[in-house]
Structure formats: C-alpha cells, structure tokens
Amino acid sequence: MMPNWSQLPEELLNLISKNLDNCFDVVHARSICRSWRSAFPFPSSLSTLSYSLPTFAKFPLVSKDLCTLKKIQIFLFRARNPAADIPEYFLGGIDQDQSNDHMELPSPLQCSVKVKFPQSDPFLVNMLDYQIIPLGFQYIMIGWDPESLANGYVGVAFLPVKKNGGDEFVVLLRYRNHLLVLRSSEMRWMKVKKTSIASCKGLVSFRGRFYVTFLNGDIYVFDPYSLEQTLLMPSEPLRSSKYLIPNGSDELFLVEKFNPFPEADVLDLSRFACRVSRLDEEAGQWVEVIDLGDRVLFIGHFGNVCCSAKELPDGCGVSGNSILFTNEPGYVTFAYKYGVHTGRAEDELNIWRFSREIRVMIVNTFPVVALRLERQAENLALDT
C-alpha cells in the first residue's frame, strides 16, 4: 500500500525543506506529491533567467529584431552505477524543455530531466540515477543572428546595478573585434572604445565591475557606469594565455598558462605550466597563490568555473588544489597541480604542472563536454 505522503505535518515538511542543500533534491521532493510544492519552492538556480535584447548582428546598424540573454546553470553529471569500468562524466548546462514534443511525465515519482549526451538523441534520465553537482553558471546569447549557424555563445558578461533607486543591468559583449555595451535604461548597443590595442579574449563580472582579458595579455577593469578602464596586470608580467575564474562573489582567480621553454626547438605542450593569482581588490593587485585549498578550477568549454572538490563525485579523479582545462588540443589532458616532480632537472618545482596520476580523455565537447578518466597504469606509454 502506497503511503499517503500528503498527510505529513506541515512542520515536518518545513524542517525537511531547510535541510535540502542540493537543488535536485528539492525537485525530487516536489515530485513526491502535489501538496508538497508549496513547502518546497522551485530552486532559483534551475530557473532560467532571460532578457530580450536588441540584436547586434548588423551593428552598427540598429535592428528591430530581438535576441535572448540567458543565465544557464552548469552541472557535472555522473551515473551512480556506470556500466563501464572506466568512469565518464558530462559537463554542461540544463535548460527548460521548450521543444514541440514536450510531455508531462507519467508518474509524480519520476524525477527526470531531458538530457542530450554525445552521439545520442535527447532522452529522459532519472536524476536519482546520477550524481549531479552544480558548478556555477554562465550567460549566453541566443538567436542574435537567425541567418548564422554560429548563433550561440559569443562571449558576454552581465552585471546588475543599482541606479536612481531602481534595479538596472549592464551587458558587456564580445562580438568579432568589438566590445559592445548595453544598458537596460537605454536598450541599445554601443561600441566601447578600448584602451588595449588587441582583441578581447574573455570577460567576466565580479563584485560590480567587468574584468576583460585581451589577446596580447592585457587585463582591464571596466566601471559599469562610466566604462572607465583601468589596467590591472600582475607585478611580474608573463607572455601567457590568461583566464579569469570567479568563485561566486568571494574570489576572482587569474590563471596564466605559458611555455617555460620559449627558445626550445620543439614546442612541447605537455610541459606548459601555469601561474595562479587571486585578486586583492582592496590593494588593486594580483597576489600569486600556490594553494587553492579544496578548490578545483575548470577552464575551457562552458566557461570557467570554480567549485569545491568536496562536492565532486567519489573517484572522479580530480582532487582539490588543481586546475583542469577542458579545451586542450588533442582531446587528452591532465589536471595541473603545484609542485609536481617531473624527474627532469630543468623543470622548476615551484610551479603548476601536469599531474599524470589521472589521464582525462575529452571524448566530446558539444552539446556537453564528455570526460573519460583513466588511471596512471593505463597510460604509461605517454611517459615514454
């Protein structure tokens, strides 16, 4: 006989709701019976925040067409009982199902989400069968050029602002070789006069400001009101690729990936190293760090995100105090760690390098990133 879950006291439901930390646990609780939904509000992190904005596809011409700015939550998926011995993980976003074949689930006990994994048609998976870990979020532009095949993410940052006693927002966008800005009070795109001579590479918002990296290595801070730009470079500049990774609103990390042997005859990507810094906002400078604690930095596809290793699935192969690039050439990568012994006398120890404990195969990158982890014993051939 099925228990009548609707008879649970409201006081007990309120107590349960206060102890659910995972957004998918909340969704599962809401699926038990309809009367529970008032006690378990739908998680805000799964609600797709979106804004209709003027399209910029024909900039500087003004268009009456609209595009959509969406805030997408990024998750890491792993089957609790994988069929294969080699674990696979999927990194990607979850959005609302707006397809024509959208259907109501046949049972309130079925807590499912529609997923598109590599080399498969979209299908429903029961969330209870997966470990699902939130890794942050990103903003994407959709439908900005209906005639273009590349109508997805182009590089955008969103910043809510308080002005004239009301809630407004500012959007900074990387489009081709331009930086465009839109204020909600005006709803039109304007070109930003850049201080750097190079093209924009990446941009994030953090604590009320925009931070922008350029291809020549410049890093600038943009004030959202005046668009005044301030150079914010490390005290010891490196010829490197620079990546900005916010840790919520608590910290902003800078990862610089560089070749420690630029004069070598052969370019060896496996010997590239990283330097990691954290923003000291009060001092207005980058402070080098050698210990990320339990944090893991994911850099590459689906933006750059930071999470606690304690939230990652057991045996995932990525431990704390590490960096994982998901956009490495050749679809093979390793986590970067500090102080790795390579056995080569010329390799500096006090630096972030490949740790070959776990090899990460990047099986697919769209529509989600598929990662396959292999133990060191399985890839000794790479060290020869």
Curated annotation (Swiss-Prot):
Pfam families: Beta-prop_KIB1-4, F-box. The keyword Repeat applies. It comes from the Eukaryota. Residues 3-51 form the F-box domain. InterPro entries: F-box-like_dom_sf (IPR036047), F-box_dom (IPR001810), KIB1-4_b-propeller (IPR005174), SCF_F-box_domain (IPR051304). GO terms for cellular component: cytoplasm. Kelch repeats lie at residues 87-137, 259-309. Keywords: Kelch repeat, Repeat. PANTHER family: F-BOX PROTEIN SKIP23, LOW PROTEIN: F-BOX_KELCH-REPEAT PROTEIN. This is F-box/kelch-repeat protein At1g64840. It comes from Arabidopsis thaliana (Mouse-ear cress).
